[in-house]
Regions:
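Non-cytosolic coordination micro-motifs
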Residues: 24-61, 101-224
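Bacterial N-terminal signal peptides
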Residues: 10-19
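Short N-terminal signal/transit or membrane-insertion segments
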Residues: 23-29, 83, 91
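Bacterial N-terminal signal peptides that target proteins for export
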Residues: 1-11
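Mid-chain, structured segments of secreted extracytoplasmic proteins
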Residues: 64-110
Length: 224
């Protein structure tokens, strides 16, 4: 009987602990939520959404805005340990948030220190040995290594090291929308490559036409 009672108590403790371990929301980073519109995020960070960087226009619209954390005006250390945050949008919906931490704000912290702090927000993650490459649509970007990862069925959070920036970062993304966005970016790049020869021909023809128009105009008005 005591054994049964202990088993029931243990099971109850596990069930109570489950929401704490697995109930974290992987669709958010602080006040920013995946799926939010470009207009909403632009307003939250005080930017004009019309100035978003165009990554791909076809077969789907992929855009990006970057928010830079400013130092305190009084010269004191910044209140947030963030260098900048990049927001990526697929057809107007936020599908990825990439946070890069300020070097001075995390000076002295080990990878394990940061994984522990992130786990307090997102629950138990998976430490990766060896580290794996962090995907990026920028082919010229320096390599980034994923150190740890937190997953649910729809979203993922990754803690990575940025070689180019010599700092660490956090990425929060929708698995479904990220896959669609990356496919669209690849297709757009492929189409642009296929169209490049014809675009160069069109450019050269236009250049010749423009020069001829300028010649005809100037030959009438030229007085030596």
């Amino acid at each position: 009987m005591d054994m049964i009672r202990k088993s029931v108590i243990s099971l109850g403790l596990v069930l109570l602990a489950t929401p704490v371990i697995f109930g974290q929301d992987l669709s958010r980073y602080r006040k920013f939520a995946l799926g939010s519109s470009l207009a909403v995020i632009s307003k939250q960070v005080g930017q004009d959404g019309r100035q978003a960087t165009l990554i791909s226009e076809s077969p789907a619209l992929v855009q990006e805005i970057t928010y830079w954390q400013m130092d305190a005006s009084d010269g004191t250390s910044r209140s947030e340990p963030i260098s900048h945050i990049t927001f990526d949008f697929f057809n107007g919906a936020l599908y990825r948030i990439v946070v890069v931490y300020d070097q001075k704000s995390i000076e002295g912290l080990t990878e394990d220190d940061m994984v522990k702090a992130i786990s307090a927000r997102y629950g138990i993650g998976v430490r990766l040995y060896p580290e794996i490459d962090f995907p990026s649509h920028d082919v010229y970007a320096a390599p980034e290594k994923v150190i740890a990862r937190w997953d649910d069925s729809e979203n993922s959070v990754t803690f990575f090291h940025s070689t180019g920036l010599e700092s660490f970062g956090l990425s929060v993304f929708s698995k479904r929308l990220s896959a669609q966005a990356e496919a669209a970016i690849i297709e757009s790049a492929k189409f642009a490559k296929e169209q490049a020869p014809q675009k160069e021909i069109d450019r050269q023809i236009k250049e010749v036409d423009d020069q001829d128009i300028a010649r005809q105009k100037n030959i009438k008005s030229f007085r030596p």
